[in-house]
Amino acid sequence: MADIVKTTNTAGRAMDPPRHIAIIMDGNGRWAQKRGLPRTAGHKAGAETFRRIATYCKNIGVQYLTVYAFSTENWKRSEGEVSAIMGLLKRYLLEAVDTMEKDHIRLHFFGDMTPISPELRALAHETDEISAHLPEGDFQANVCLNYGGRDEILRAVRRFAADCAAGEKKPEDLDDALFSSYLDSRGIPDPELIIRPSGELRLSNFLLWQCAYSEFYFTDVLWPDFDEAELDRAIAAYHARDRRFGGVKK
């Protein structure tokens, strides 16, 4: 399937995948309901899809993959569903701790980790420590956990205000680059392509600052059914776009 990505455009130039792809992993519950299964079965299937798509992204040359795993609004779901999602994350992190170095996969977290269980926070910290010792050029998966775009911006504003109060920064110092350094995504390029499966046509509070010039790809495919061929179609659609960044094509 990688041949679909490593294709050529009308000028005959090879088309590489975007450097940074972000995905809103949506549709797990509906996937399960269509099959008469509990919603937790959909989340389990979605977790397997994440593993497969992350591996494929790494293999075709994507450097960063950011996924929306659990939003600040997802706490409104049933206690059983939240517990199941956190259990899947724990299992994934336990596996990742043992394989990250061998597979050359860096793992980073976006979001406010304060409400997360101490055990899960400790695992996330351990993966961060392992990632810090891996080469920066290695593939990196960013997992958005208890994340919301507005919350991220508010936390960044508070950190900047605290630095101003401490005399370390001045309000007039603030520009795009400085503000970006206070975000969860600091040091990571903005996503060129944001993908949302499941047929929904909204961002749902995902990467609100970082998506300023992202291209969007929406598909009716539910996340557990999202496969390498669908990702290839998303990347092909991305390459068909005329990205002008507010300018005029010469």
What are these regions (language model features)?
Residues 1-250:
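Flexible, compositionally biased loop and terminal segments
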